[in-house]
A protein has these predicted regions:
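N-terminal membrane-anchoring/stem segments of glycan-assembly enzymes
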Residues: 1-107
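Internal catalytic domains of large membrane-associated glycosyltransferases
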Residues: 2-3, 87-343
Length: 343
């Protein structure tokens, strides 16, 4: 469909002001539901109670005599690990609270949605096959006319770059939705700089961007539901899914996949319950409101030398915090299936 299109769409710049990490802007009021407070009480209060009780019993197990330094060191490490195990348990218990029913209604006049895949030398056969599968599914949904694929490449090696362009030509011939491709000559800021460059140059073209990793795969029904929830909730800045691991071939990889499939949904419900609208962002398999991201998530360059200074590497949770600081809801919805990532 898009084989004869130019490599990139017309420029639609969006200003992305660098944020201060030292001085917060005036924060609009945010509402935390009673359900979230209750989940936090169960998760953190329960872990505190269980961990304290376990540590007290460990101390009593030392006997009535004078404890030694080694015993106190043992107690400290026992408490640290036991509190962690206790929190894992109580956080899952919080997930048994009833899930909030989220609004979902597609806006017939809604803006465009970019499926953004940053790449850096990955196998183009794998990445483009995943994008083609998603494009073919999306073409059968109500959001087909709104969706475009945008590959933002930071690939530096010439052979890998040529491989990307060859695979791109095939993808554009076969894809039922538009496919755009941009490669930076220098990967300034790495992945966060790659995404920032996209937002600054074409952010004004899109209402939302679905962030994908090179090994991400998402079902069209899930993408449609995510867009519908964003359309229905104008204060929702970021919606994260719980990706399911796929593609493992070794025995260990298969075991990890099985474990994730077995108790991952329970963990996801617990995390979603106690985080509420103060959620996290894992950098992929999520949908983001572009203008909210642009106005809130311009990352500064930290003062000092690496690794303390320089560009922020673990940028995703910082971006989630900046969105929430600006008053946007950041949420993970564990009921959204059909989201996958390679192991």
């Amino acid at each position: 469909m898009s084989a004869n299109l130019p490599a990139v769409p017309p420029a639609a710049p969006l200003n992305m002001r660098v944020q201060s990490l030292r001085k917060a802007p005036g924060r609009p009021p945010v509402y935390t539901p009673l359900r979230t407070h209750l989940a936090r009480l169960i998760a953190f209060g329960g872990a505190l109670a269980i961990g304290t009780l376990g540590s007290w019993h460990m101390l009593k197990a030392f006997g009535d005599g004078r404890s030694t330094l080694l015993q106190y060191i043992l107690l400290v490490f026992f408490a640290l690990t036991f509190y962690w195990v206790a929190f894992s348990t109580t956080a899952c218990l919080a997930g048994f609270l009833p899930l909030r029913r989220h609004k979902a209604a597609l806006d017939p006049d809604g803006g465009k949605v970019a499926l953004v895949m940053p790449v850096y030398g990955e196998d183009p056969a794998m990445t483009h096959a995943a994008l083609l599968a998603m494009a073919q599914q999306i073409s059968q949904t109500a959001i087909a006319e709104r969706c475009e694929i945008f590959i933002i490449s930071d690939t530096q090696k010439p052979d890998a770059w040529l491989g990307e362009t060859r695979a791109l030509h095939i993808l554009r011939e076969r894809s039922p939705i538009p496919v755009w491709y941009r490669r930076r000559a220098q990967n300034v800021g790495r992945k966060s700089g790659n995404v920032e460059n996209f937002v600054r140059r074409w952010g004004g073209r899109y209402a939302y961007m679905v962030m994908l990793d090179a090994d991400s795969l998402m079902e069209a029904a899930t993408l449609t539901e995510m867009v519908a929830r964003m359309d229905a909730e104008p204060r929702l800045g970021l919606l994260q899914t719980m990706p399911r691991l796929i593609g493992g071939e070794s025995l260990l990889a298969r075991a990890i996949q099985f474990a994730g499939a077995l108790y991952g949904p329970i963990v996801a419900r617990g995390v979603a319950a106690w985080q509420g609208e103060d959620g996290n962002y894992w950098g992929h398999n999520a949908i983001i409101r572009v203008h909210a991201f642009a106005e809130s998530c311009g990352l500064p360059i930290l003062r000092g030398r690496n690794p303390i200074g320089g560009h922020i590497m673990s940028h995703d949770f910082v971006e989630a915090a900046l969105l929430r600081r600006a008053g946007w809801d950041v949420r993970m919805d564990p009921d959204l299936g059909g989201s996958y990532e390679g192991l």
